Amino acid sequence: MSTESLNSLSDKELHRKLIQSGFPSTPVTETTRAVLIEKLRKHTRADKLKKRSNKYVLYSKEQQESPPFPQYHQYHAPQPPQNYANGLDNNNDLDQTGGSSAYNRSLDESDSSPLQLSASKMYAPPPVVASNYDGDCSPHSLGLNGKYLQPCSMPYAIDTSNNYGKPSGKAKLSDGGVVNRLLSFRDTTIQRKFNYPTGQASRIPLRKERLTRFALSDLKSFIRNPDIRPYVIPRVLISLFLIFLTIITVLYVGKRFEQSPIDKAALKYTLCNPNDMQMISEKVNCIEKDSLRGALDMSEELFRHLNERARLHHCKDANLSPALEIGEFVREMVSNPKTHRGNLHSNLMAAKYLITENPQWSIQVVDSTKHLGQTSHFELSEPNLPLKCIVLKKVTRFFTVIGALLLIVAGFLIVYVAVVIYRVKQKEALLAVDQFQKDIINELIYLSSQSESPEVVINQLQEKFLPAKKRSKLLSSWNKALKQLEKNDSRVLFGMVNRDGKAMRTIAWNRNVDKKDVGLVKKWQSPAFDNSNKIANPPTPCLKIRHMFDSSEVDQANLKQSIVESIIEKVGTRCKICDVQLDVQSCCVYIRCASEEDAGTIHKEINGWWFDKRLISIKFLRLERYLSRFPKPSAEPLYFHTNEAANTHS
C-alpha cells in the first residue's frame, strides 16, 4: 500500500488498519498520524517481503524404482538472474534458466527413516531465500557460492494412503525441514496448482491460463460488486430490450408479404357427384375433382395479382385502383404460356366457387348487377403489405388524425384567446373612460375654485391627462369620456372659443349647481391599516385632525356641518363632542371632547381611514393649547344623539 493511499485514509480507517496489522490501540491525532502511517507502511513492506520469501517451487520426479534411500543428481547452479521482482515467477522458471539441471540431495541414515514416495512432490525454496534458515545443514539451504550445503535428515515420512502428509516424528527446532513439514499438511489440490510437468514446459499456456482465470475473477467481482449493480443492471436490461426489439423488427422485415393465405388443409368445398347432371349456368354449387387443382392454382395467381395491385395502391399511388376486372385477369392468364386455354373458363368458375366458400382468403367478387356502371371485378379486402408500407401508412394516418385534432384545438384556443383579449381590452377601455371622467371633473372643480374663469380648452386637458407615448392608444377612451360627460352630466358645460383665429372647444364647471349635490359630500372609504397601534389610554380630551378638507372647500357654507356629520357617522353616540373648530389656513379640524375616553374613541375610529381620497391623521392636543388657540367656543355646545344624527343625514 503506497503512502498516498495511506494518507487518503480517515482516522477511523487508519486506526482499524493498525489494529489489523497487530499494532496496539493508539489514538490517531494530527501529531501521531504521520508516525503511525510510516510504521504501517514499513510493516506492510515487511509483510510483502516475507510473503515473497515463503513461496516455493514445486517439482516432481517420477521414480522408476523405489530404493530405500533415493539419490539425487548433483545440482549445478546456473547463473542467478539479475532481477528478482517476482519471487513466484522466478521460482517457477528456475528449471528453465540454465537448461537441464537437477538437485543433489541425500538423507541422513542416522537421523531419519526412509522417505516413501510413489511420485515425489515437495516444495523447495528458491536460491534467494537461503538466508531464511538458521541451520547450516538444511536440506534446502543454498550457500553463497550457489551450491547446496550438506543435506540434513528429513524428520517425517509421507503416507501415500491419503492426500495428506502425516508427521512421522518430532522435528527439531534447528532442522530446516519444518517448513516442508508444515507445507505437507496442505491439500494436494494446492500442490497440483503449482505442479508442472517434467521437462522443459512452456510458459505461454500457463500465462494464458492465468490471464483467463484473472479475467473471469475480475468479471465475477465486477458483477458482484454492490456499488456497480445499480448502474449496470438497468443498462443491461435496456440493452436486452433493444436487442429483443431489433430481433422482432428483423423477423417482420424478413417476412414475405406475398405469402398467400390459401391453406389447402383448411379448404372448404363440395365435390360434384358424377352421376348428377350439371346444368350449364353461371351459378356453381359444387366443384369437380379434376378442376380442384386448377382452381387452386388460379386462386393463388389471382391473389398475387390483387396483392400487387393493393401494394401499389397503398404504398405507391393512391390513384391506382386495387380492384382487378375479370376480363383483365383473363387476358393476363391467356398471355401466360403456362396457362391451358381449354379449361380456362371452367377453372375460373371453380375459382369463383372456392372464393365464395372460403371467405378467409379476403378475396371479394363484386358482381356487375349490384353496382351499375361497373363490370365484375375482384378486390382484396385485407392485403399483405410490406412492413415498411404498413408502418408508413400507420404513421401517416396517425399524424393526419393528430394534425386534424391539433388544428381543431388550435382553432378553439385562438377563438378563446381572442375573446379573452377582447374582453380585457374592453374592460380596460371602460376603466380608462371612467378614470378620465373622474379626472376631468376633479380638474374642473379645482380650476373653478382657483380662478374666476372656469373655462378650459379641451386640448390643454388632453395634453395634461394623455401622455405622448400613450396618446394614440388612449385617444379613443378620451373621446368616449368627453361624449359621455356632454351627454349625461349636467355639471359640465361645453362651449367654443376663438383664439388666434382658431375655434377651440372648451369645457367648464357649472357653478350654479348646488355644491352639496355635486359630489362633494363627505364620504368614508376604507381603513389604511389595522387597530394594532391604537392608543389605550388617551392623554387629553382634545384632538387635531388633518386632511378632512382642503383649500378648495373653504368657501363652502356647510363645510363644518358636513364634517361634523361625517364624524358622528363614524363614532355614533359613544362619545360627546363639546366643540369643533376649523382652521382654514392649515386645513385642520380641532375637536374638544367631554372626556379623554371620548377623544380616544374618535382617535380609534377615524385615525388611518381614507376620507374623500385623503388619509386622515389625528394628533392629541393639550387642553391648555386648545384653549389658548380657541378661547371662545362655538355658540352652542355640540351634544349629538342618535335622533339628531339621523335628522342631520335626512
UniProtKB/Swiss-Prot annotation:
In this chain, the stretch annotated as Involved in inner nuclear membrane localization covers: 1-214
Ranges for the region named Disordered are: 61-119
In terms of superkingdom, the source organism counts as Eukaryota
Task: From the UniProt record, report the name of the gene that encodes this protein.
Answer: MAN1
Which regions face the Perinuclear space side of the membrane? Answer: 252-400
Tagged with keyword Oxidoreductase: no
Specify the species: Drosophila melanogaster
Q: What GO molecular function terms would the record report?
A: chromatin DNA binding
Name of the protein: Inner nuclear membrane protein Man1
- Function (record text): Inner nuclear membrane protein. Acts as a negative regulator of the BMP (Dpp) signaling cascade during crossvein development in pupal wings and possibly during synaptic transmission at the neuromuscular junction (NMJ). Appears to be required for pupal development and consequently transition to the adult stage. During pupal development, plays essential and redundant functions with the other LEM domain proteins; bocks and Ote.
Keyword Kinase in annotation = no
